[in-house]
Amino acid sequence: MRAWGWVRNKFSSEDDYNDGASNKDYPDRFNEFDNSQNDHNDYTQNNAQFQNAQTTTFGRTISRVKAYYEIPEDDELDELASIPQWFKKNVTSNIFKNFLHYLKSLFPIIEWLPNYNPYWLINDLIAGITVGCVVVPQGMSYAKVATLPSEYGLYSSFVGVAIYCFFATSKDVSIGPVAVMSLITAKVIANVMAKDETYTAPQIATCLALLAGAITCGIGLLRLGFIIEFIPVPAVAGFTTGSALNILSGQVPALMGYKNKVTAKATYMVIIQSLKHLPDTTVDAAFGLVSLFILFFTKYMCQYLGKRYPRWQQAFFLTNTLRSAVVVIVGTAISYAICKHHRSDPPISIIKTVPRGFQHVGVPLITKKLCRDLASELPVSVIVLLLEHISIAKSFGRVNDYRIVPDQELIAMGVTNLIGIFFNAYPATGSFSRSAIKAKAGVKTPIAGIFTAAVVILSLYCLTDAFYYIPNAILSAVIIHAVTDLILPMKQTILFWRLQPLEACIFFISVIVSVFSSIENGIYVSVCLAAALLLLRIAKPHGSFLGKIQAANKYGSDNIANVRDIYVPLEMKEENPNLEIQSPPPGVFIFRLQESFTYPNASRVSTMISRRIKDLTRRGIDNIYVKDIDRPWNVPRQRKKKENSEIEDLRPLLQAIIFDFSAVNNLDTTAVQSLIDIRKELEIYANETVEFHFTNIRSGWIKRTLVAAGFGKPKGHAVDASVCVEVAAPLRDANLSAESSRNLSRIITPIYDDEEGNVSGHIYELDGKNNSDLSMHCQKGSNQVEIEFVEFNSRKYPFFHVDVASAVVDLQHRLLSPQKSDSFGSLKEGGTTTIKKIEN
């Protein structure tokens, strides 16, 4: 109550208490009401008068408090941007229609299937069968990487291609087993079985598919796919390359025939042990090395011949695509000839029994304990699923000129893995190699996945007897050949270094950690380093003080046109010494921030501005502290000048700062507080009011934030009626030619048309040439054309400008040349500009 009394006495007048009832009468009235309880109606009426008076008093007092501290009214802020408007625009506007659109977007097949062209069917059929011939040997090979029986790779292959087409926004992506995810699955199986050996490898892999698929689907449904963008390309390339090296080294023992003798886990140890056991090489190496040579030879020869003989390019492409299937078929035939009489003890390592059909269809075994054991393994699994699929989908969408919907792609991948658990499939994601084959085969729509699924089913029901004799060494050769495409080429590595050395370091560190520690650590390190680099860039933004140069377009040797003023960083002169950069007017500074102005960088930016300005301006008072005892501890003692000293500080006094917000997309509370602190600090330093001007503001919310903090207009004063306002003045119902637009460049004099001397327009000088498009708009019997004013910025906030040039002109006019300010007059809203024709 004491606080309210102080506020009332400071900001209220006695007239505030005379509305409805006199303030001094209230105690008597309350005594009267206490003694006369019978007259209840009179009590109610007088009490209402009392409350009305109190409400009026409170409201007026609050208004005076806001005026005293220059706090804008809520209505004034809502004109710039308001929460109800945003909520109405983004949430409540057509909410039912948006909900239906959301449900429809979950099934993109509804959009493109009715428009399916029958002529596309042959392309989809060829692409589907081609991918099917590749996915069968790859699926069985990747199941080996995941330490699962071969049939589980086929189960994942079938579900991936069959389900994805109903939810896909990419026609090229092929979902199924991939090398990196298979390796992660193997790591997860090993870690969980080390905790509890009661679970089998397929049970663990299926539960992992359930949890990872549910998380991925949830991210897509909630439209949170943008979080993937926080991981840059070098980080993805780093752990992908590390994973490829891990897979490649892990398949060498099986390729050479001494798989059981290499037990190391880290990549570098696997390489060392593989080299130590080279004397233990068996006959399997003949199958593996020959197959590997044929695969690489066929690949490079088909690529070379396809370029050399473009006429036969399609035939070479088909040969190159089917090379893995042909190698597996030929190798299996040779293996059958060798092992058919030695089924119980084959001389080479073969796959042996592969169950026919879908032997494990049903509800999987999922327990709480298994889910708890898998919890720590989920982050890395989800990251790999997300990054591999989205990066592949985006790259093929960019190459083939269509756009994907990342969130819908996550839903498609999540649903595919969720349905796959009923077939005992392990986690699947987009495959780069199979997607590339699918795209080159001329696929037209996602329906090609149905034909790929048919090939997988055919192999499961008709070819399982033949799968018995597939040599493991050949499957290892197929894996090694496939993962070499995941290793980043040297050319791309050098490009990373040339573009961004810091991001290239992330790539190298990720590869090193993956090789010498583990794939999981490599992924975590790359993601953490990418996040640290992002925060570092936000916390240490690049800011520049600007100067002016005159730019023009030069045509030929003599023709120069479109001369204009542009503002560039002052440090550009160091890069180009011949460039003449004109500094802003004395006491005026122009600062451009190249990042959003938020709490991580607020302190650094304010320090940068304060130091630069204090270095280039002088204090308003030489010694603001009369006595040394009043000097703060952090302010150095000023030396007394000698009496005969003629040294004078010629630096200007600080007058204004112009902030170029063209690159600022966000402005938070901490940043605004730093602006307030800078203004306070610099006003103490300059011993006068320092104007803060803002240009190129991109968002109404940024304007609202600045206005709420007291920026946008002169501090402590009402807005002058003669303030300069940027306007656009188009011809009514006409399009000016470029020549006539240039003829409107010089203002001769303002036109005053009211008693207060306000300006409603200006007379422009014309050269009398090429003005036919102006003359046709002259009124009959007159030589004048009226042009309407359209204001760019609000008259309420004269310190908000459309660009830097207009802010500088305004400051030159009002601060540096105050005697000229009357010539500008004021601009009436809805006024007109008059153009006077001057004949030759």
UniProtKB/Swiss-Prot annotation:
Question: Quick check: keyword Endoplasmic reticulum in the entry?
Answer: no
Query: GO: which molecular function terms?
Result: sulfate transmembrane transporter activity
**Which stretches make up the STAS domain?**
578-733
> Residues bearing Phosphoserine?
S823
- Topological type in the membrane: Multi-pass membrane protein
> What UniProt keywords apply to this chain's record, in alphabetical order?
Membrane, Phosphoprotein, Transmembrane, Transmembrane helix, Transport
GO biological process terms, alphabetically, are:
chloride transmembrane transport; sulfate import across plasma membrane; sulfate transmembrane transport
Looking up PROSITE patterns in the UniProt record yields: STAS
Q: What InterPro entries does the entry give?
A: SLC26A/SulP_dom (IPR011547), SLC26A/SulP_fam (IPR001902), STAS_dom (IPR002645), STAS_dom_sf (IPR036513)
Q: Where are the transmembrane segments?
A: 120-140, 148-168, 173-193, 208-228, 230-250, 278-298, 315-335, 410-430, 447-467, 470-490, 505-525, 527-547
Query: Which Cys pairs are S-S linked?
Result: none
Its subcellular locations are:
Membrane
One GO location term (cellular component) = plasma membrane
Which PANTHER family does UniProt cross-reference here?
A: SULFATE TRANSPORTER
What is the role of the protein in this entry?
Answer: High affinity uptake of sulfate into the cell.
Instruction: Spell out the family assignment given in the record's similarity comment.
Output: Belongs to the SLC26A/SulP transporter (TC 2.A.53) family.
Family matches, as NCBIfam families: sulP
Q: What is this protein called?
A: Probable sulfate permease C869.05c
